[in-house]
Amino acid sequence: MQNAAKGIMKRLLWLCGTVLTFACFASAQRLPEIATPESYKLTFTPDFDKDKFAGEETIQLHVLKPTSEVVLDSADIEFQEVTIASNGSTQAAKLTPDKEKEIVTLAVDKPLAPGPATIHVKYTGILNDQLRGFYLGKDEQGRKYAVTQFEATDARRAFPSFDEPAYKATFDVTVVTGKDLAVISNSNQTSDLPGPGPDQHTVRFATTPKMSSYLLAIAVGNFEYVEGSADSIPIRVWSTPGKKELGRFALQAAEQVMQYYNRYFSIKYPYGKLDMIGLPDFSAGAMENTGFITYREILLLLDDEHASVNAKKNVAVVIAHEMAHQWFGDLVTMQWWDDIWLNEGFATWMESKPIQVWKPEWHLDLDDVQDTNQSLNADSLANTRPIHQAANTPAEIVELFDGIAYGKAAAVLRMLESYLGPETFRAGVNRI
């Protein structure tokens, strides 16, 4: 029975990870397979007064076949200078933007040979008010902050990129901003130096592990934090001024969740630190950026002494969901958005487990039953859809973030776990 169950698990994982991958390649509208990125070096200089930012970018890439063109995702970007270097020569690129498709084609006179190449770009972008890309928000006192929200297809609004989940690369981020403003990103700070202007400082961050562009994150503003740790991993909970003590419960929850996940998974948390920030202006409930999770304030900050049990449950479960994404989605990522259920379904299935161990009196196992029933009801409607569904455009991709990708996918995983047994299923998950 044990061996048979393991065989079933293996076949199911193969179907999820292989057959659906072939399906997404067949149907999805993608960047041409001309080159792949290896690394990005990015410098951002936000200007809060003009609602703009200056950007400078160097992309190290590998050209796959001879070509005179490289296509990047790009939206709301004003290019100032673009060059491509290859085989010892540097050429100015001619640009052909396509606003409808949100791409730009970089053309050079001398074809690029297969092998390494470097794209260098100077540009400006918009600190928009649309809560996507690189945008401006305000706290209750009217103080501005700049923050990113890139999932699913909005990294291209902050820097020209291979803005698809399959194109993983490392990122080196530098931010030049006002000397009194804090800067947070995915990795640890490596330096914080005054200048170049008299009222500025320049903050540099360590090279990230390879990751998808939608997981890059930056926040710049008047922020403060409380801090702790779990399994020697530093954890900080950030807020706008005057609210840092409201992060104590979230910090405690994150410490508990980190310890649970490090025991559950065969790979311990791989990112060195975890920052979490609650923002007044944030469109999503939360976003699982690698090593730096962003939240809507109400889903991270609360008064531990006076908050209801339901409010605490909501915060704890959202934290557990986003931290589960550090493995499901960040470390292991779907090839294309057709399979977003693999990200969201696994994180939703996982979210109650550490909280049930930490707070058994909350009976989150009963909540799982209720959630499964709600998913069954939703899936009985005439307008339901398959878990795996093709999506080509940004608008179609956004539509996939629904109750099917979260609730139904999690319900299917709970069913498989129940059939195979928790330990067999866990062993299969750890082999993905």
Segments from the language model and where they lie:
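Hydrophobic alpha-helical and helix-loop surface patches within well-folded domains
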Residues: 79, 89, 205, 234-432
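Compositionally biased non-globular segments, especially hydrophobic aliphatic-rich helices
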Residues: 7-8, 21-26
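Bacterial N-terminal signal peptides
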Residues: 13-23
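Hydrophobic alpha-helical segments, especially transmembrane helices
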Residues: 11-12, 409
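Acidic/His-enriched low-complexity segments
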Residues: 24-272, 298, 303, 401-407, ...
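N-terminal secretory signal peptides that target proteins for export/translocation
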Residues: 1-10
